[in-house]
């Protein structure tokens, strides 16, 4: 009698264990697709964030080069027009001729960079990824350095002239130097953007 009772009480316990095991299996089986879906969403989100960051960097670099283009144009145009006769002619001063030369160089460089950007926007062929970023970084740095050297060379002579005579010639010289300095700032910031893009470049 006691054996029968034990057998009958053991059967439900075994059924309960089997049911629990089946439930665990169902949970595990349903969790795998959910984990895979979550992982896929994470990858997609990371890719979207990367695209947005690249787009922001591209727009920032282009905007800074547009500003540098405008400032460099003003720098050499204002200095080139700074001709008021006698000693008040920029051609008489090596420092001012240097400002004009570097302003023209910066203008040409930024023009070429903007043309490259336009080619990319229209789906044209540009340099390969890493090479393009290296060209941007090196070009921005070198041009910014040259602009800063031109500004540094022209400031002392302008200050000495203004101590003796503050006139339209010295004012125009100061305005040109200021434009060259703003062009330097824009290209220096653009070099930082290019450097960040170079550091984040993938090597696959």
Curated annotation (Swiss-Prot):
This is CASP-like protein 4B4. Residues 1-60, 120-130, 197-204 are cytoplasmic. One of its GO terms (cellular component) is plasma membrane. Belongs to the Casparian strip membrane proteins (CASP) family. PANTHER family: CASP-LIKE PROTEIN 4A4, CASP-LIKE PROTEIN 4B1. The keyword rRNA-binding does not apply. Keywords: Cell membrane, Membrane, Transmembrane, Transmembrane helix. Homodimer and heterodimers. Residues 82-98, 152-175 are extracellular. It is a multi-pass membrane protein. It is found in: Cell membrane. The chain crosses the membrane at residues 61-81, 99-119, 131-151, 176-196. Pfam families: CASP_dom. The keyword Chloroplast does not apply. It comes from the Eukaryota.
């Amino acid at each position: 009698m006691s054996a029968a009772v034990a057998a009958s009480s053991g059967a439900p316990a075994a059924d309960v264990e089997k049911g629990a095991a089946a439930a665990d299996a169902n949970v595990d089986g349903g969790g795998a697709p959910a984990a895979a879906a979550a992982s896929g969403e994470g990858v997609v989100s990371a890719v979207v964030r990367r695209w947005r960051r690249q787009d922001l960097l591209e727009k920032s670099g282009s905007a800074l080069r547009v500003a540098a283009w405008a400032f460099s144009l003003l720098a050499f145009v204002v200095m080139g027009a700074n001709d008021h006769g006698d000693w008040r002619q920029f051609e008489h001063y090596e420092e001012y001729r240097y400002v004009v030369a570097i302003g023209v160089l910066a203008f040409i460089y930024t023009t070429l960079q903007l043309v490259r950007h336009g080619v990319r926007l229209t789906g044209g062929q540009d340099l390969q990824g890493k090479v393009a970023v290296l060209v941007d970084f090196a070009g921005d740095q070198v041009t910014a350095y040259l602009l800063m050297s031109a500004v540094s060379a022209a400031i002392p002579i302008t200050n000495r002239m203004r101590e003796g005579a503050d006139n339209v010639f010295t004012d125009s010289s100061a305005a040109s130097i200021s434009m060259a300095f703003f062009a330097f700032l824009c290209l220096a910031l653009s070099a930082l953007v290019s450097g960040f893009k170079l550091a984040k470049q993938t090597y696959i």
